[in-house]
């Protein structure tokens, strides 16, 4: 019974700490996460559409066409 009370108090304390920390950090994130395709194209140098590629290496900004062996951009929606 005593152990159960200690565990309950510990869980409540940790929950309160997380809520306080979450309120303090709201709106302070400097770099918002980008979409994965945008992040990849901005973080690495990649080959533009029409360039020669191999399907085993991920060097295209979009994707490497399997049969033609050239880079193709992702379709824009």
From Swiss-Prot:
Tissue: Expressed by the venom duct.
PROSITE patterns associated with the record: OMEGA_CONOTOXIN
A GO cellular component entry from the record: extracellular region
Transmembrane residue ranges: none
Keywords: Disulfide bond, Knottin, Neurotoxin, Secreted, Signal, Toxin
Signal peptide: 1-22
Free-text note on domains in this protein's UniProt record: The presence of a 'disulfide through disulfide knot' structurally defines this protein as a knottin. The cysteine framework is VI/VII (C-C-CC-C-C).
Its biological purpose: Omega-conotoxins act at presynaptic membranes, they bind and block voltage-gated calcium channels (Cav).
Protein name per UniProt: Omega-conotoxin-like CnVIIJ
Annotated organism of origin: Conus consors (Singed cone)
């Amino acid at each position: 019974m005593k152990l159960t009370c200690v565990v309950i108090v510990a869980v409540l304390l940790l929950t309160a700490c997380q809520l306080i920390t979450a309120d303090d950090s709201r709106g302070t994130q400097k770099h918002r996460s980008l979409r994965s395709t945008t992040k990849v194209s901005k973080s690495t140098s990649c080959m533009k559409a029409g360039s020669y590629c191999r399907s085993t290496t991920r060097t295209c900004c979009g994707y490497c066409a399997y049969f033609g062996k050239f880079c193709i951009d992702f379709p824009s929606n």
